[in-house]
Amino acid sequence: MAHERAGQVALPEDLINVDALIGAYYDLVPDPDNPDQQVVFGTSGHRGSSLDVAFNDAHIAATTQAIVEYRAGQGVDGPLFIGKDTHGLSGPAWKTAIEVLHAHGVDIRAERDEDFTPTPSVSRAIIVYNRDHAGPRADGIVVTPSHNPPRDGGFKYNPPHGG
């Protein structure tokens, strides 16, 4: 059943303050002893809002570092495809991830001009690359909270099988 306001213009109370969201992403520092502010990386990655100190620069830097270490442990040393969606926190989190990956010398593959990339496109790029190359395997990251509200950010790891 569709929402009663589906297809209608958003009301003022539906809108978020993207500048406040991004400011909180960089300015608020999570408390590692507070369970509500810890990374919870489930089957679809980590999701949360910077306003709740649940999706911030420190979270994404640490999660990306963990992915770098996981890749090394799994022998995944091919390119890493990274994409992002249009949510307000996706751009800042994408940049944080790129910085960590670059610092570790990861071969990063991203959309030209920092454009948006849907999750299936990243998955397909991984699958096609691994199918067509006998050498090092590729994997990926998608910065998206998927269907979560606009105030949320999301960060997903796609292993070499693409999903």
Language-model regions, residue ranges each:
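An N-terminal, well-structured beta->alpha segment
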Residues: 2-99, 134
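N-terminal small/polar loop signature for handling phosphorylated ligands or for N-terminal nucleophile
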Residues: 73-76, 81-151
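Phosphate-binding chemistry for phosphorylated carbohydrates and sugar-nucleotides
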Residues: 12-15, 20, 24-27, 107-116, ...
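Metal-dependent DNA phosphodiester-chemistry modules and their immediately adjacent helices/loops
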Residues: 150-163
